[in-house]
Amino acid sequence: MSNFLRKKLHLCFSSSGGLSPSIPSSPIIVSNHNAQSHPHHTPSIFINNFNSLYDQLSVSSPLHRRHSSENPAGVFSTNRREEEEEDETTTSVSKLLSGGTAIMKHIESPDPYRDFGRSMREMVEARDLTRDVVADREYLHELLFCYLYLNPKHTHRFIVSAFADTLLWLLSPSPSPEHFLS
């Protein structure tokens, strides 16, 4: 890992608070004073915790269990209980994600520029950048570094292009996402 990235990695993680009580956390607890004494340990701990959160979601989800059923016909059959489980899952996932920040990771996409751009604009709209200019600039800086750090190097050109267009979209008099997706 480059020295520059190691120094800037802390920008990818919000310092405004801890985990929401509804989010399951792993037993590893990281305190702020420990992060400065061991800067090379902090990134892997955060990333492992971040990844384990999504692993727990996908494995423990009733939707995941239903699709991994040995009975292929069971995948397509629906009944009232399955619909209730799906509603509960949707509610629990939306509760889980409502207090956090989701960053799009690259998957093989026919148009990664468009996907990253849409994701960034959704993040900016959810943040409502009308507060303090310095805080907004720091948030955008953090957003860019998170996308760059969490995605492979071959996607960085799409991320930087999408980020530049997101900045232009923010600075335009009447932001229209469709204009910047072409």
Swiss-Prot record:
A Pfam cross-reference name: Ovate
Domain OVATE: 104-169
GO cellular component: nucleus
Record-annotated membrane-spanning stretches: none
Top-rank taxon, per record: Eukaryota
Purpose of the protein: Transcriptional repressor that may regulate multiple aspects of plant growth and development through the regulation of BEL1-LIKE (BLH) and KNOX TALE (KNAT) homeodomain transcription factors.
NCBIfam families hit by this protein: A_thal_3678
Anything else known: Plants over-expressing OFP11 have no visible phenotype.
Name assigned to this protein: Transcription repressor OFP11
